[in-house]
Amino acid sequence: MTNTFFLAAETLPLEEPINPLIPPLYDIVWSIIPFAVILFVFAKVVLPKFQEVLTQREDKIEGGIQRAEAAKAEAQEALEKYNKQLAEARTEAAQIRDDARSQGQKIIADMKTQATEESNRIVEAGNKQLEANRASVVADLRKEMGENSINLAERLLGEQLNDDVKRSGTIDNFLAGLDNVGTAGK
């Protein structure tokens, strides 16, 4: 029996040798059909959802980038606005400081002027008061000196100077002599 098997094998036409890397045609056909079905399902169901998720992520990332850029631009604008306000405040402070300094100098000048005027007024009032006191003292002294000179003249002359005209003339002569001596001494 073994011989018949060999004989049958020898009588069969020879086929090409079997390559283990290339599968038979029926395997290829039956493998392509499920692959096509899986590919169709993948293309119609999975791939659109995957594309949708990718689009959402891309939009979210781009939106985040745009929001970040907008926030950055807003922050830059706020910084510029802050710097501008700070510069304006510094300018205003410098102007206020200069105005205050100018007003202070005006106040000092006004106060000096007022003090000088008040000082001059006080000195003038003092001079007037001194002049009035001097005139009063001179009048009192003239009166006393007149009386003393009359008393002295009466003692020297030994006569009474009752006559007002004589008395007045004697006093005037005596005081005129004193004034001449006082002005000559200066």
Swiss-Prot record:
Its main location: membrane. It is found in: Cell membrane. Gene3D superfamilies: F1F0 ATP synthase subunit B, membrane domain. One of its GO terms (molecular function) is proton-transporting ATP synthase activity, rotational mechanism. The chain crosses the membrane at residues 28-48. GO terms for cellular component: plasma membrane; proton-transporting ATP synthase complex. Keywords: ATP synthesis, Cell membrane, CF(0), Hydrogen ion transport, Ion transport, Membrane, Transmembrane, Transmembrane helix, Transport. It comes from the Bacteria. The keyword Transmembrane helix applies. InterPro entries: ATP_synth_B-like_membr_sf (IPR028987), ATP_synth_b/b'su_bac/chlpt (IPR002146), ATP_synth_F0_bsu_bac (IPR005864), ATP_synthase_B_chain (IPR050059). It is a single-pass membrane protein. Belongs to the ATPase B chain family. F(1)F(0) ATP synthase produces ATP from ADP in the presence of a proton or sodium gradient. F-type ATPases consist of two structural domains, F(1) containing the extramembraneous catalytic core and F(0) containing the membrane proton channel, linked together by a central stalk and a peripheral stalk. During catalysis, ATP synthesis in the catalytic domain of F(1) is coupled via a rotary mechanism of the central stalk subunits to proton translocation. PANTHER family: ATP SYNTHASE SUBUNIT B, ATP SYNTHASE SUBUNIT B', CHLOROPLASTIC. F-type ATPases have 2 components, F(1) - the catalytic core - and F(0) - the membrane proton channel. F(1) has five subunits: alpha(3), beta(3), gamma(1), delta(1), epsilon(1). F(0) has three main subunits: a(1), b(2) and c(10-14). The alpha and beta chains form an alternating ring which encloses part of the gamma chain. F(1) is attached to F(0) by a central stalk formed by the gamma and epsilon chains, while a peripheral stalk is formed by the delta and b chains. This is ATP synthase subunit b. It comes from Corynebacterium urealyticum (strain ATCC 43042 / DSM 7109). The gene is atpF.
